[in-house]
C-alpha cells in the first residue's frame, strides 16, 4: 500500500459517506402538507386530549428588544412571529432572520397558557382567553435592561389570570410568568402548558440548499429528560401519528433547524407530560403539560416557564437549561465536533477571525497527528521495500492463495511491518474531517462569518470556486510527490483523475471546510518532505523520479 492507494481509499470512504447521507435524506421523505389556510384557528385541535386549546383571533402586539422582535396574539398570548435583528436573513441583507412565522404558506408558533380543569385555555371552558394589554407596542428603551409585557384576563367568575412576558437585554430566553387570583369559593385546578407547532413541509422560499452535495442538518422536534439527555423526534414520525407521550420531572421540549431553535422549559417541582401531536393540515407539534396545582379561594398562585427563541449559542443555552446546548446538531460525530468547536472558539478569542482560527486549528490537529503520519509513511516505505520479495513469492507459489497468505504474514512478522500501518492514520483523519464539516454546518457562530478577500461566509460555498481549485492543485502536488507501486492501469487512471473528482465534490462544500483541507494538504507536503529525508537516511526511500 502507498500514499496514492490511500487517496483512493479516502475517495471511496468519502463517496460512500455522501451516498449514505443522501439515502438518509431521501429514505423518509417528508409528507405532503395540506393547505395551511385558517391554521391560526384550528392549529391545536388534535391535541385536545392534552387539554391544549385551539388558537383564535385577537389583537397582535409588538414586543422589541435589542435581539428579539416578537409579535404576540392577545388571544391566548401565543408568540406568532419572531425576528432576530442580530442575524440577517441573508449575507449583506438588511432583513432580519425570521424564526417564527404565521402566514398562509407556513406556520411556526410558540403557544403557551393555563389549562387543567379550571384553566382559561382549557377547550372545555370555552374560547381561549382574550387578554387585555396596556398598549400595542412594547420596546426595550436605551438604558433599560428588562422589559415586562403584562397581559390580564378575568373570567365570568371573577378570577383574574395574569400572563407576563419578561425579556432581558441581549437574551434570547423569555420568561413567561403566570399569576392566578382565585376570587371564588372553590379551589382552582390549574396546569401550565407550552407547545411549539410548525408546518412539516417547508415552502419553496424557505427550502434552500437541498439540491447540492451539502450535508443536511436535522430539522424536527427534540426533548430532554433526566433519563434521556437529548432525543430527536422526526416530523415524519409525528405525521405518521407515532407520538411521544412520557412523564418527566424537569427537562424541555424543542423544535430545531440549522443554527436556530425554539424550546419550552417548564419550571415546577411536579411532573410534566411531554407529548407530540399531528395537528392536521400538515402541522406537527411538541409540547408539555404540567401537573395540576391547586389555588385556594382568596389566594394567588404563581407558575412560570421559559421560552428560548433564537440562535443555538451553546454556552447561553446551557445556562438556561441542562443539556439545551445539545440541540446544536453535530451529527453522530458530536464527541469530536464539540471539543473541536471549543478549541476553535478559544483560538478565535485571540485571533478574532474564524478563517484564521481554522488555519491555526488545522496546524494543531496535523501537529498532534504528526507521529501517526510519520508512522504511516514509514510503514508504506517498508511495504515498498518488501514488494520484490512479495512478487517473487507470488511467482514461486503460483495460485496457492493460502500458502501466499501464510508466507506473507510470516514475512511481515519477520520484517516487523504492519500491513495496515498505512491505513490507521487515515481512519483517524476521516472522522476529524467529517466532524469539522458538521461543526461548520451546525455552529451559528460560523454562519455568515467572513474570512478575507472574496470569502464573506465560511459556512457557504466559495462563490468563485477558487478555494476548491486550489485544493485540487495541492492534492495534485501531493500525488506527484508520492512514490507509487500501483501497476494496475485502471487504478492509475483513477489516481490521475482523483484531484479533479475531489475538486468537483468540493465546489459545493463550505469555504471553511475547503480552507481546512487546503491548509492540511500544504502541511502534508511539508511533512512529506521532512519524513522522506529521514527515510532516505535509513535507506527506505529514494528520490528517483516517478515513472509516468
UniProtKB/Swiss-Prot annotation:
Coiled coil: none annotated. Interacts with the Sec translocase complex via SecD. Specifically interacts with transmembrane segments of nascent integral membrane proteins during membrane integration. Keywords: Cell inner membrane, Cell membrane, Chaperone, Membrane, Protein transport, Transmembrane, Transmembrane helix, Transport. The keyword Chaperone applies. GO terms for molecular function: membrane insertase activity. The keyword Nucleotide-binding does not apply. It holds the Pfam family YidC_periplas. It is found in: Cell inner membrane. The gene is yidC. It is a multi-pass membrane protein. Required for the insertion and/or proper folding and/or complex formation of integral membrane proteins into the membrane. Involved in integration of membrane proteins that insert both dependently and independently of the Sec translocase complex, as well as at least some lipoproteins. Aids folding of multispanning membrane proteins. Belongs to the OXA1/ALB3/YidC family. Type 1 subfamily. Residues 30-50 have a biased composition (Low complexity). One of its GO terms (biological process) is protein transport. Its main location: membrane. HAMAP family: YidC_type1. CDD domains: 5TM_YidC_Alb3, EcYidC-like_peri. It comes from Escherichia fergusonii (strain ATCC 35469 / DSM 13698 / CCUG 18766 / IAM 14443 / JCM 21226 / LMG 7866 / NBRC 102419 / NCTC 12128 / CDC 0568-73). GO terms for cellular component: plasma membrane. This is Membrane protein insertase YidC. PANTHER family: CYTOCHROME C OXIDASE ASSEMBLY PROTEIN COX18, MITOCHONDRIAL (PTHR12428:SF65), OXA1 (PTHR12428).
